[in-house]
Amino acid sequence: MIARAVPKTGPRRSRLLYVEEHAENVALAEALLAGRKDLLLLHAADANLGIKLARSRRPEAILIGIDVDLAGMSALEFIKVLRADPATETTPVLALAADTAPGAIVKALEAGFFQVIAKPLQAAPFMEALLFALEFAAVERSEYNPLKESR
């Protein structure tokens, strides 16, 4: 379950929480992130644990498969819980989806997902989306955030 990554060296690392029940998918994400000493991959095998870790560990970004139910909770229910909680309401959540038709992407974004990434997970689109999410999180969590002033 919890943090799997390279040993900590240097400054604090950004945390990515991956909510995924299949070990082979987690292994793929680990392989894609293996060279990134600035990232720590946290893993939750079900949505309930994912919510607990999102609240307690406050990851900078979350990745979840949108096409499956994780322990009886859909990804859409998962995002509703996160968006209703002040501690997680602005955390960027990346949706990993088999269905990337325009209508499905619009539905995911309207539900509160930050971005949709096509399955299977591929290095370039995944890293591009993740880096954008981490930049957003850095601004969102910074002391000076002009977006917070307008809320």
Residue ranges and their predicted role:
Residues H43-A61, V68:
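Acidic, metal-coordinating helix/loop segments flanking the phosphotransfer/catalytic sites
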Residues I2-A3, P7-R12, A138-R151:
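CheY-like receiver
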Residues K52, S74-E89:
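Short amphipathic alpha-helix used as the core "switch/output" element in two-component signaling
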Residues F114:
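Short, glycine/charged-rich "phosphate-handling" switch motifs in NTP-dependent
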Residues H22-L28, L70, T100:
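Short acidic/polar segment at the start of the alpha1 helix of CheY-like receiver
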Residues L121-L130, S142:
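C-terminal output helix
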Residues A23-L42:
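Two-component/phosphorelay signaling modules centered on CheY-like receiver
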